[in-house]
Swiss-Prot record:
One record GO biological process: killing of cells of another organism
Remaining remarks: Shows a cis peptide bond at 29-Pro-Pro-30.
Family membership: Belongs to the three-finger toxin family. Short-chain subfamily. Type IA cytotoxin sub-subfamily.
Keyword field contains Signal: yes
Keyword field contains Membrane: yes
Protein name: Cytotoxin 6
Assembly and interaction partners: Monomer in solution; Homodimer and oligomer in the presence of negatively charged lipids forming a pore with a size ranging between 20 and 30 Angstroms.
Tissue specificity statement from the Swiss-Prot or TrEMBL entry: Expressed by the venom gland.
Record Pfam families: Toxin_cobra-type
Length: 81
């Protein structure tokens, strides 16, 4: 019985994702996605002319540079975008 219990515990630990996974909002904030490995930033992209209306949100590995037309805001905590 102890062997079976130990086996179940080991299988559970191996199957679980024990690493930290970041969660980022999608375009509509109540919905979010779990970022893939290596994507350790959340981002929000919006047009400079309309800064209150995000155009795109998601996970990214490196924060892109903003331009005259498009601005990116990046962060590294769950659902911070």
């Amino acid at each position: 019985m102890k062997t079976l219990l130990l086996t179940l515990v080991v299988v559970t630990i191996v199957c679980l994702d024990l690493g930290y996974t970041l969660k980022c909002n999608q375009l509509i904030p109540p919905f979010y996605k779990t970022c893939a490995a290596g994507k350790n930033l959340c981002y929000k992209m919006f047009m400079v002319a309309a800064p209150k209306v995000p155009v795109k949100r998601g996970c990214i590995d490196v924060c892109p540079k903003s331009s005259l037309l498009v601005k990116y805001v990046c962060c590294n905590t769950d659902r911070c975008n």
